[in-house]
Amino acid sequence: MRVTKNKIDCLNPNTGRRISIDSAVYELFSKAIYDILKKEKKGITYTEIVNGIKKHFSDQKITFKGSIGWYAVTVKHDMVANHIIETWMENGTRLHKLKK
């Protein structure tokens, strides 16, 4: 993750490409993803992460007008690239959890 003025470059570990997003949006999503994964010990799917973000935003009374799914995958990929999240396949399903 590279930070420039009010932007963060998010790295996709699959392609090696970077995409810049607003740093406040990055913080919002990374905190939500971290909080969701902190509660899960076994690992959860991407769909469960997105649903958890929506619930987190609702609980916190956060209104977000952009695509939650797009930002969720972008920030999640950056967190994987920075070794905050680990992913693995189990019975044909990709699971995610915080790296120990």
List the model feature ranges, each with a label.
Residues 48-53:
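A short acidic, leucine-rich amphipathic alpha-helix
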Residues 74, 78:
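Alpha-helical DNA-recognition elements
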Residues 90-100:
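Short, cationic-aromatic polyanion-contact patches
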